């Protein structure tokens, strides 16, 4: 559904066939169409594997399903709360809340769009992890390494590109951007821990460790609210963005450390060193070409080159990941 929404929504935004004045109702209809299409496709696939359907209410089975499902539902609610409560608190706490909430939303919309791509990646990983956890933990650890290198390596490049070119990127979309640059940069810094959550949170979900995930998410909400209460009155949208970055970082570290302990992940410094070298290389390139008109292009090319040089993208490992998913 998300992939369909991204494709149709992106086409509607940038196509020459769309009207000059785009209304919010257009996106409501696009989202409704995507949900309906996904439902119909899912039903068509499901019907092939079922006998003649009939309605029958089994109370005990329904209760069993609810008991098994509610931890997942609670996790989704908690994660959405500590990810999206900042905008609500910003509007309520700050003296100029409506304006600051608008400034925050300018940057958050772009983060949310990238978040959707990450969710697609996590959705692909979940069944792979679930399947392999039943057979071999060693295979799962290889998959975690491959997926982490692939996703987080790309995210490091995205973070450098968006942070260093914040005014340019925001200027493509909005007219008044000066107040939004700082919040946008902190929000994009938070995309790296979000990527970590996609990997390690998905691994824990596939292993059924919902209790620890819900506990971490609950602590994330407490931390997020506390930091927002402290920072928003003085710093407004920037304070809310810092709160988001800090909260995502804390939850990512907690999930990562628990995964190390739970799955006995080897503590090899090489993996972390590769990401540090990638970040250092991109920082050097960004500093040296800071005044260049082609900074973004240089960063992208350099980032991709470094990713391959550091073997963060291993084509054989990716092929193995694809074959494992089948």
Language-model features: locations:
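Specific pore-lining/lateral-gate transmembrane helices of multi-pass inner-membrane transport
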Residues: 103-217
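Membrane-proximal transmembrane or re-entrant/amphipathic helices at the cytosolic face
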Residues: 286-326
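Alpha-helical transmembrane segments of multi-pass membrane transporters/permeases
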Residues: 1-12, 184, 194, 200-226, ...
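Residue-level signature of transmembrane alpha-helical cores of multipass secondary-active transporters
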Residues: 31, 35, 64, 68-80, ...
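Interhelical loop/hinge segments that connect adjacent transmembrane helices in multipass membrane
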Residues: 17-30, 42-83, 124, 128-142, ...
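Residues that define the loop-to-transmembrane-helix transition and helix capping
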Residues: 24-25, 99-102, 181, 210-211, ...
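Hydrophobic alpha-helical transmembrane segments
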Residues: 1-48, 219-223, 237-258, 302, ...
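Helix-terminus/linker motif at the lipid-water interface of multi-pass membrane proteins
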Residues: 14-20, 77-114, 131, 167-176
